[in-house]
Design a protein with these regions (language model features):
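Feature captures the catalytic ectodomains and active-site-proximal regions of enzymes
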Residues: 1-287
């Protein structure tokens, strides 16, 4: 089937608090396989004179396609923001084209409650799975298992065109143990969960009729001893990995920023952004 005749689908996977230098040194199998079908970019977050390297800030930037000085999420606890003007990329896609089926699976408070700037994911996310990590003894270590199970099942059997899956164990590991062996073990578990999602997608009976773009990113890095929020290079480092599962040839941008994830997803889904969206990113896929 010709590429333009295939139904486009997008999966964005978020790993919280993953340092790009650590990830590149480990070169986990699943994320490396995605990169081999596209590209792996190192990205840099704004300095602290713009916004701290915090979870809510990073994910708001990724999901809206605008920088913190525009969406004005400037901390995890902030209730003042402009997300009503800059909704998430799934909501944008759904509002532009209601035939696009959207799905998200997460367990962080900012996605499923009104904590701080939440919920960062808006009403255009038509299927939402959220587990409250506060009710599980292991926190993200427990809920990531449930999130990955839900994503594997839905991605393999249901018709979701634009999906976002968030996994948070890596951030918890860095906070508790610093950037070391325990952190790397958590990254390896996230990569195994990614592999299961990709395997489920490939096993879809309609896979040959679909064009799947998979992207991965993180909201911030960590200091060596664990912790973030300041402006060190360790905390400001991030990454974007993107690849087409069917191996279709594509021309990719040479440089990337985290605000480019949203317009890349829209471009693959054939959603034309309105000028009123004021998106600050550009598609990483050449037209």
């Amino acid at each position: 089937m010709a590429e333009l005749d295939k139904r486009p689908k997008v999966l964005v996977v978020g790993w919280d608090g993953v340092r790009d230098d650590t990830l590149r040194q480990m070169a986990p199998e699943a994320i490396s396989e995605i990169a081999s079908r596209g590209r792996w970019w190192t990205t840099t977050l704004p300095d602290v004179d713009i916004a701290p390297t915090m979870t809510a800030v990073g994910w708001s930037t990724i999901l809206t396609g605008v920088w913190p000085d525009r969406h004005e999420v400037l901390g995890n606890d902030d209730t003042y923001h402009l997300l009503h003007r800059y909704p998430d990329m799934l909501t944008r896609a759904f509002c532009a084209r209601p035939d696009i089926a959207t799905y998200a699976a997460t367990s962080a408070l900012i996605f499923g409650t009104d904590f701080g700037p939440g919920p960062v994911l808006g009403p255009g996310v038509r299927t939402m799975t959220w587990f409250d990590r506060r009710t599980y003894p292991g926190g993200f270590a427990d809920t990531d298992v449930l999130v990955a199970d839900d994503a594997e099942r839905r991605l393999g059997t249901q018709e979701h065109d634009f999906s976002f899956v968030y996994l948070g164990e890596t951030d918890s590991a860095a906070h508790a143990h610093g950037v070391g062996s325990r952190y790397e073990e958590a990254i390896a578990r996230q990569d195994a969960r990614l592999a299961r999602m990709v395997q489920a997608i490939r096993a879809r009976p309609t896979f040959d009729d679909e064009s799947w773009l998979v992207m991965l990113t993180t909201d911030h890095g960590h200091r060596d001893e664990g912790g973030h929020g300041r402006g060190s290079w360790q905390e400001r480092q991030s990454f974007v990995v993107a690849g087409l599962l069917d191996g279709s040839p594509a021309t990719w941008a040479t440089e990337a920023a985290n605000v480019d994830i949203a317009p890349t997803a829209w471009a693959h889904l054939r959603v034309t952004p309105s000028e009123r969206w004021l998106c600050q990113g550009t598609s990483l896929l050449a037209p």
